[in-house]
Amino acid sequence: MRIFDTSKREKVEFSPIKDGEVSIYLCGPTVYDDAHLGHAKSAVSFDLLRRVLKALGCKVKFARNYTDIDDKILNKMAQTGQSLEEITNKYIAHYESDMGALNVLDPDFKPKATQCLEAIISYIKVLMDRGVAYKTSDGIYFDTSKDSGYFSISGKDNNTDLIARVASFGEKRDEKDFVLWKFDEKWYESPFGKGRPGWHTECVAMIREFLSDKENDKFEIDIHAGGIDLLFPHHENEASQCRCAYHKNLSKYWMHNGFIKVNNEKMSKSLNNSFFVKDALKNVHGEVLRYYLLTSHYRAHFNYSDEDLVASKKRLDKIYRLKKRVDGVQAGMANESFKSELLEALSDDLNASKALASVDEFVKTANERLDNNPKDKAYKAEVVANLELIGEILGIAITNYVEYFQFGVSDEQKEHIQKLLDERAVAKKERNFARADEIRDELAKMNISIMDTPNGAVWERNNE
């Protein structure tokens, strides 16, 4: 498998530290608000990576953290009067619900910063003992001048605008220096004084706590992932701390997904063009949004448009219509050529768009073969297995097709539709075909189509 290693600025052959085992850390959200499309892009991109590695036979340990103590959360507390736990628990629950709707596999580890304070404090003590951290009136800071490898991950330099635009840095020795522990009497006890951890320190401590091989003094993990907006300074600062604390690299590979754009503008709250995943899920099934996110390469800047979302739904609908055709058939063996085609595309730095093109071709071919030979049980069994493979690797076409096609219909509406179908069944039994047709027309006006099967009528919501 080849992946793009941001720190190398090129595609490289992926070779895990321990053969057959892969450790991945994904920077998760700061939980002060609901998940937006950028969070979804990152989660889906590296969920795909995890699925592909598992399909290739690797045992994967996957961690995704929650930053649950941060200035933004404190601001939310001041605005709402709610406690830290009330705010963070609420948005963690919302985030997990949203990611579940996108078929993102639950991580093996979901550490929260506030649950790892002992590890964070111990880590800061190591940095202080190494002489690479210093104290000011407002906190403990990391001395970036002690790291000759600073900028090695991001490839930036001291002339970058991100550095130059800092006009004043108070008691810090250098504008690049960052806080490890922020003094604040309202928060947590530590040997340095009451306070709370700095963002850049939390992730390193959690990686060491949950993914590193501490028993054998092996700190390095295989892959550190996140959005490209985290590359500098966040990931640069993480890597720098690890080198200075343990004289070891934090991660062998660094992977980053691209920005989200909305109508060709970068999505951001300042531009008032960001939107929440929960709002998108009111209008489309979660798998549609996942499919749409997969149509663009994970490193590309993803440009959201309603038209492209609709196009993705139409492509996914075709997969579900095939699933409907083979409903009730026991899975056989997946076609090895098809499996190889999928994995070959995805092993090339997660080329999901190429993999989806292979899926499109499979669906087209399957429908043609079933049209020509609808009683071919062996082929139907192969189709079911291929569909299961698509679900396993790409995380789509997992839902029951009835549920998928009935998305967006309320329970109250479903009850009303079922009453009409029951009435229609009685009318047909009594050979009152005029009434049966009236009910079909009434349902059509509700944007509902019905199909008669040996087991009774089934219905679905049409595209509007």
From Swiss-Prot:
Motif ('KMSKS' region): 266-270
Pfam families registered for this protein in UniProt: CysS_C, DALR_2, tRNA-synt_1e
Single biological process term from Gene Ontology: cysteinyl-tRNA aminoacylation
InterPro entries per UniProt: Cys-tRNA-ligase (IPR015803), Cys-tRNA-synt_Ia_DALR (IPR015273), Cys-tRNA/MSH_ligase (IPR024909), CysS_C (IPR056411), Rossmann-like_a/b/a_fold (IPR014729), tRNA-synt_1_cat_dom (IPR032678), tRNAsynth_Ia_anticodon-bd (IPR009080)
Cofactor or coenzyme needed: Zn(2+)
Note on how the cofactor is bound: Binds 1 zinc ion per subunit.
UniProt: Zn(2+) binding residues: 27, 203, 234, 238
Parts of the chain that traverse the membrane: none
HAMAP family the record matches: Cys_tRNA_synth
Protein name (record): Cysteine--tRNA ligase
Gene name of the encoded protein: cysS
